[in-house]
From Swiss-Prot:
Subcellular location: Cell inner membrane
UniProt pathway annotation: Phospholipid metabolism; CDP-diacylglycerol biosynthesis; CDP-diacylglycerol from sn-glycerol 3-phosphate: step 1/3
Domain notes: The HXXXXD motif is essential for acyltransferase activity and may constitute the binding site for the phosphate moiety of the glycerol-3-phosphate.
Name by which UniProt lists this protein: Glycerol-3-phosphate acyltransferase
Motif HXXXXD motif: positions: 306-311
Organism lineage: Bacteria, Pseudomonadati, Pseudomonadota, Gammaproteobacteria, Vibrionales
Gene it is expressed from: plsB
EC code: 2.3.1.15
Length: 809
């Protein structure tokens, strides 16, 4: 570096340190991008800019990366550690050619690779973005533009606090040399590829240009499908075309978002304060996968589970902080009240009625609006369950939005569409007490400003929040596999709804929900709730609780559930202490130590948190219950029983393991129980270790309430094979409700109608009922006997008496 450059850099550092507060994306590029800091590193920046270079330097050093201004020494040659892909325009001219010194550096590096087969220089493309405001539709400006000195000074002053430093995945020059050679033309090609790459980075951070709402409405009104729907509306209601058009305009105004970057930017500060007020921290996992999709030009559809109204804000906040564009969010029309509605709308929410069956004009406009969002490249978010889960379990998916997504693809989108499942978890859900009341029969309170204010008054520290991005589902690939000729149904007019859509959407919905559960986050509270609720008195000594949490942690770590779920890194003791600090347990002390328990009210609320992760323990718990309730089992007997019960658990809890994987998985779980000294395995015979029976009993009881429900339904069928589906559902609910009173079962979902509805659809799939609803008596009786064997005697007796009573009535 020349002395003149060094002096100018020194002069710039002071004002930049005061004006610029950038954010590095990702926050840990060495791990996220698998950067080997022992190999040579060169940074590539889009434009010649000392300000960008110094901003990059600051963040690189903070992140443990080499100083871009330090020389790169290779085989005695001293080279620059950075290149500019394009020159910066001055006030009087614009020079977008690749600087000759950059081409020279690339050429030198490629030549060195030709001489040394072991050399591998890593090029890290890095972009410094000053503000993320999207452009306006019709401006026809490139996504990423160079700035002259005055423009850069203005950007630093106005957007210095909204600066992003994006580090992209490394480009291996060894790979480039082996794939494309080392002559000088490759250096030019490398620079051209980098320029395209930088434009995509900017697009991923800012999103596509935004239209004005009126321009958008005018474009929608010209849609042939909407024009036809307006004509039908006028004809069917016997009104003028002008009045029908006014209705269409009103519907568009009700639905459409009015995205405002300035609101998102200001809201980010408010939400930052809110999360710090509410939570001790946010744990975000697998965001790098989503960033890659955005940068590769995918149309991203986020499909999170729905725990709380906080979900709307949390996911947008996380995406913004991860350097991506907050999505357009499908929100229920119940949230369109003053003042929340207008704020949500400007934050990207578009509103949807709970039902619009039979309203052709509304459904057509909504479908066309959604297709417009996809066509223009805006990311979209909708809650797959349709509403917030009141039980903490994942609800079966509502398929309407998913079907409309597929229909939008049939318009001929020119980009791949990818679903991104998202698991959102909390150590405290603000509405959880309200959910318990609603499950006991209280009417849901309509959302309003007063409800918001009452909620805000309760703000306090709620522990940790979790956002885990699940394994993406590429829809183009999915359709290629499940509807190979789908492209033949592409219709730019949007009138296509082929016969294959319904079955494909139903399968896709199940896969989507399974991927959400695959990305679950176990945490201190969910683990402690699971253990305490498994105890008969909802109480454990502190030592027993710690021991039980240790059992759970070892199972989760040593028998992995999926690739995307997360397990706490803290010790069992630290997790218990953290859960106690959330002030949800009753702590009593006697001469032998602390006893941790749940009062009746908290027992009901804690089922919500247990249900968040019950699927993670479904199989280990089932195996433990078999060992506790049956003597002298062999491994093959356990495998056989698991194979019979698993399909019901899989359907109800959206479990991901395939049936053909079960035998191997059972062996892995048994081996882990052996390593924890809970059981012994001798010549294929399984025996419980009496010294550690409590841990095994608690593990087994987690799934026992689910098995009780199955036992109720199957024994009703055995007693009365002619029962119609509606009668079977009602009688099962009646017996389940009776069990809750007689045996102190506090789970609100225990007699939930939806849970039984899921069970009965699986009865048909597994051949216990035929397509006409006729029962296979022998098969059903055998399964009912197996379920009885897994229940505790007092519960079994209550079910037997209740079934007999209902049959005699």
């Amino acid at each position: 570096m020349s002395s003149g450059q060094s002096f100018s850099h020194s002069l710039l550092k002071l004002p930049l340190s005061a004006l610029v507060k950038g954010t590095a994306i990702p926050s840990n590029p060495i791990d996220d991008h698998h950067i080997d800091i022992n190999k040579p590193i060169v940074y590539a920046l889009p434009f010649r800019s000392a300000v960008d270079l110094l901003t990059l330097q600051k963040h690189a050093l903070e992140l443990g990366l080499p100083d871009p201004l330090s020389p790169l020494e290779i085989h005695g040659k001293s080279l620059k550690r950075y290149v500019f892909i394009a020159s910066r325009p001055t006030l009087v001219q614009s020079d977008n050619d690749v600087p000759s010194d950059s081409i020279a550096l690339f050429s030198d590096l490629l030549a060195l690779h030709a001489e040394d087969s072991e050399l591998d220089v890593q090029v890290i493309p890095a972009t410094v973005l000053w503000g993320r405001k999207p452009g306006k539709e019709g401006n026809n400006k490139p996504y990423l533009q160079a700035m002259n000195g005055l423009q850069k000074a203005k950007a630093v002053i106005t957007a210095g606090r909204d600066c992003l430093v994006r580090f992209s995945p490394v480009v291996s020059l060894r790979y480039m040399a082996q794939s494309h050679g080392t002559d000088s033309s490759i250096a030019h090609k490398l620079a051209r590829v980098a320029r395209i790459h930088f434009s995509r980075q900017k697009l991923a951070a800012s999103g596509p240009d935004l239209p004005s709402r009126q321009v958008l409405f005018a474009r929608l009104m010209k849609s042939p499908a909407i024009e036809q729907a307006i004509e039908e509306e006028a004809k069917n209601k016997n009104i003028s075309m002008e009045k029908a058009r006014k209705e269409a305009q009103d519907i568009m105004d009700e639905i459409a978002a009015d995205f405002s970057y300035s609101l998102v930017k200001q809201g980010d500060r408010l939400l930052g304060w809110l999360w710090n007020k509410l939570y001790q921290g946010l744990n975000i996992n697998n965001a790098a996968t989503v960033r890659r999709l955005a940068q590769d030009g995918h149309e991203i559809v986020y499909v999170p589970c729905h725990r709380s109204h906080m979900d709307y804000l949390l996911l947008s906040y996380v995406l913004y902080h991860e350097g991506m564009v907050p999505p357009h969010i499908a929100a229920g029309i119940n949230l369109n009240f003053f003042p929340a509605g207008p704020i949500f709308r400007r934050g990207g929410a578009f509103f949807i009625r709970r039902s619009f069956k039979g309203n052709r004009l509304y459904s057509t406009i909504f479908r066309e609006y959604l297709a417009e969002l996809f066509a223009k490249g805006y990311s979209v978010e909708y809650f797959s369950e349709g509403g917030r889960s009141r039980t903490g379990r994942l609800l079966p998916a509502k398929t309407g939005m998913l079907a409309m997504t597929i229909q939008a693809m049939l318009r001929g989108l020119n980009r791949p569409v990818t679903l991104v499942p998202v698991y959102i978890g909390y150590e405290h859900v603000m509405e959880v007490a309200t959910y318990a009341k609603e499950l006991r029969g209280k009417r849901k309170e309509k959302e309003n400003a007063g409800l918001v204010l009452r909620t805000l008054r309760k703000l306090r520290n709620f522990g940790l929040g979790y956002v885990n991005f699940g394994e993406p589902i590429p829809l183009n690939q999915y359709l290629n596999e499940h509807a190979p000729e789908w492209t033949k149904d592409i219709d730019p007019m949007g009138a296509s709804r082929p016969q294959w859509i319904n079955p494909v959407v139903n399968q896709l919905a199940n896969k989507m929900m399974t991927h959400i559960n695959d990305a679950a986050a176990a945490n201190a509270l969910t683990l402690c709730a699971t253990a305490l609720l498994a105890s008969r008195q909802r109480a454990l000594s502190k030592d027993s609780l710690i021991h039980q949490i240790e059992c759970y942690l070892q199972l989760l770590k040593n028998v992995p559930y999926s690739k995307t779920y997360t397990v706490p890194s803290e010790s069992a003791e630290a997790l218990v202490e953290h859960a106690i600090s959330l002030d949800k347990f009753v702590i009593e002390t006697d001469t032998m130590g602390d006893i941790i328990s749940l009062d009746r009210n908290q027992s009901i609320l804690m089922t919500y948190y247990r249900n968040n992760i019950i699927h993670l323990f479904a199989l280990p718990s089932l195996i433990a219950q078999m060992i506790i309730r049956q003597e002298n089992l062999t491994v093959s007997q356990i495998q056989q029983q698991v194979a019979e019960i698993y399909p019901f658990l899989k359907a109800e809890l959206f479990l991901s393991h395939k049936e053909e994987e079960l035998d191997e998985l059972v062996v892995k779980v048994l081996n882990e129980l052996v390593s924890q000294d809970l059981i012994s395995l001798k010549e294929d015979k399984v025996a419980k270790n009496q010294a550690n029976t409590l841990t095994l009993v608690l593990l087994g009881r987690t799934i026992s309430e689910t098995l009780q429900r199955y036992s109720i339904a199957f024994n009703l069928l055995v007693s009365n094979p002619e029962l119609a589906k509606a009668d079977l559902e009602q009688k099962s609910q009646d017996i389940a409700q009776r069990l809750t009173r007689l045996h102190g079962i506090n789970a609100p979902e225990y007699f939930d109608k939806g849970v039984f509805a899921s069970l009965f659809s699986t009865l048909k799939q597994q051949g216990y009922l035929d397509s006409d609803g006729n029962c296979d008596g022998e098969k059903t009786a055998q399964f009912a006997t197996l379920l009885y064997a897994l229940l505790y005697p007092e519960v079994k007796l209550t079910i037997e008496e209740s079934v007999f009573q209902l049959k005699s009535a």
